[in-house]
């Protein structure tokens, strides 16, 4: 009955063990250290012929034919071509017999000098041994997964660790590779399996006098708690995706406000063209930065203005608007000197400030994720009435808050010309990035991949249907519960019908 119900969830999805390779004929080898000249290079060999490779490349005097090779021991040896007997190099090898190795197979690592010729000739010599071949991309890790040394989330964590360019990325990837995400999802899966076991027992053995008639309600309450936990995990605000790909920061504002100068200053190189000619930046110029360990993609955009007939510039402005709206943090630059000069010329400074339509149109782009930057503060020193400038700033910020219904707004005054307050701006960015990446629930790992979110969303939908069917049809409710188990199991690729059977036999003593 139980097996029949499991198979009825989806004819194309039968819960089963992940495929494992019992016999792998090929022994694979490749360079595990970085490509190029180096002091030491490491060549990894994995598979049934790994021990043969050792004995073929060394002389009998180093390791006797009948002598057992010491495992996890660095053995100094001279390596030779097995066909020509020509010396290849003098180095070390470390032997990792199955199953206590990275791949779960017999593995040997040759530590040799990192010259190109040494690496090439050693690889060529290994390839002469029958049953060996160069590995495909990621094949060592694939074998580790297939042999149960890593689950899918740990494999992805290893991939993220290799790609990590900031300390925060490295920290999260390392935790994932060591099983933090696996533990979290396997714990949820275990709770779902236990609740499902109660439901299955009630359906199949409901007439048994020893079964508590409230078992369905107990299972339902347990599922509500699990569902809420998963939903809370889903509401992580895209922190995990930002961690892997980088937080998007857009620099926007009117032409010649100093956007390109700012990005050049932040990157310490000439990433954007700096010119007094309005409309110089047409495309979005993106630069990847590490700000206090947080990965950031910062983009310089076209100046926002209405008075242009240049079709290319108009398209660039539209791209700037789109980038601004889809950014995690927005830096909006005003040209302090130009802004104050216009008001000095056009109105009595003792009256209230009236902003023209062009400036007011810029207000629409500002929201809670925006930092308003008043650039070119060094040029304001030529004015005598700087108190009026302070009034102007307050008036401007107040207008923006009222126009966009904002409770508060972040602002700072800088000069890209003499680096005034640039450190303060960086500190403000660090604070915003910290809030952006902050993990609210310390027990809940970050959702670093879209597929996790999809499987969890499918799981929540199944649990919602389960809660509905609990009131109408317990058999259908049970099927939805098993569908939820399947969805969450696909994250780690750990799907096993025996887990459910073990719970049933353990908790309900069916055979007595």
Curated annotation (Swiss-Prot):
Highest taxon of source: Eukaryota
Domain TrmE-type G: 246-434
InterPro entries registered for this protein in UniProt: G_TrmE, GTP-bd, GTP-bd_TrmE_N, GTPase_MnmE, MnmE_dom2, MnmE_helical, P-loop_NTPase, Small_GTP-bd
UniProt cross-references to SUPFAM superfamilies, sorted A to Z: P-loop containing nucleoside triphosphate hydrolases (SSF52540), TrmE connector domain (SSF116878)
Keyword entries, A-Z: GTP-binding, Mitochondrion, Nucleotide-binding, Transit peptide, tRNA processing
Gene3D superfamilies according to UniProt: P-loop containing nucleotide triphosphate hydrolases, Probable tRNA modification gtpase trme, domain 1, tRNA modification GTPase MnmE domain 2
GO terms for cellular component: cytoplasm; mitochondrion
Statement: the UniProt record of this protein carries the keyword Protein biosynthesis: no
Family listed: Belongs to the TRAFAC class TrmE-Era-EngA-EngB-Septin-like GTPase superfamily. TrmE GTPase family.
Name of the protein in its database record: tRNA modification GTPase gtpbp3, mitochondrial
Organism: Dictyostelium discoideum
């Amino acid at each position: 009955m139980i097996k029949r119900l499991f198979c009825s969830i989806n004819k194309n999805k039968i819960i089963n063990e992940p495929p494992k390779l019992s016999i792998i004929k090929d022994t694979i080898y490749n360079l595990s250290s970085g490509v190029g000249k180096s002091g030491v290079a490491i060549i990894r060999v994995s598979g049934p012929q790994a021990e043969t490779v050792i004995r073929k490349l060394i002389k009998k005097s180093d390791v006797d034919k009948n002598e057992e090779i010491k495992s996890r021991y660095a053995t100094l040896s001279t390596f030779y071509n097995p066909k020509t007997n020509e010396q290849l190099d003098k180095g070390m090898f470390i032997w990792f017999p199955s199953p206590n190795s990275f791949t779960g197979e017999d593995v040997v690592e040759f530590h040799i000098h990192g010259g190109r010729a040494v690496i090439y000739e050693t690889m060529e010599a290994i390839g002469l041994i029958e049953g060996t071949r160069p590995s495909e991309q990621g094949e060592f890790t694939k074998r580790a997964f297939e042999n149960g040394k890593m689950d899918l989330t740990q494999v992805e964590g290893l991939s993220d660790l290799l790609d990590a360019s900031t300390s925060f990325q490295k920290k999260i990837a390392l935790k994932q590779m060591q099983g933090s995400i696996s533990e979290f999802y396997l714990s949820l899966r275990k709770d779902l399996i236990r609740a499902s076991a109660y439901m299955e027992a009630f359906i199949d053995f409901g007439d048994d006098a020893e079964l508590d008639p409230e078992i369905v309600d107990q299972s339902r309450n347990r599922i509500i708690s699990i569902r809420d936990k998963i939903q809370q995990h889903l509401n992580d605000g895209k922190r995990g995706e930002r961690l892997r790909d980088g937080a998007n920061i857009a620099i926007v504002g009117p032409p010649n406000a100093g956007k390109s100068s700012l990005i050049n200053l932040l990157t310490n190189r000439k990433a954007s063209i700096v010119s007094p000619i309005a409309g110089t930046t047409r495309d979005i110029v993106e630069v990847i930065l590490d700000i206090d360990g947080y990965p950031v993609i910062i983009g310089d955009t076209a100046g926002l203005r209405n008075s242009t007939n240049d079709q290319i510039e108009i398209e660039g402005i539209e791209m700037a608007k789109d980038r601004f709206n889809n950014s995690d943090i927005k830096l909006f630059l005003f040209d302090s000197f130009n802004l104050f000069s216009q008001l000095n010329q056009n109105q009595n400074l003792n009256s209230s400030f009236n902003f023209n339509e062009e400036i007011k149109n810029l207000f629409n782009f500002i929201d809670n994720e925006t930092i308003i930057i008043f650039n070119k503060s060094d040029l304001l020193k030529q004015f005598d009435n700087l108190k009026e400038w302070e009034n102007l700033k307050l008036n401007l910020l107040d207008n923006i808050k009222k126009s966009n219904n904002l409770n508060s707004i972040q602002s700072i005054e800088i000069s890209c010309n003499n680096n005034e307050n640039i450190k303060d701006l960086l500190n403000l960015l660090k604070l915003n990035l910290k809030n952006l990446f902050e993990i609210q629930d310390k027990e809940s790992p970050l959702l670093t991949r879209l597929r996790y979110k999809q499987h969890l969303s499918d799981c929540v939908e199944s649990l919602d249907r389960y809660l509905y069917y609990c009131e109408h049809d317990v058999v259908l409710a049970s099927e939805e519960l098993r569908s939820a188990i399947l969805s969450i199991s696909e994250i780690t690729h750990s799907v096993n019908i025996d887990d459910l059977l073990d719970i049933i036999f353990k908790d309900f003593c069916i055979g007595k």
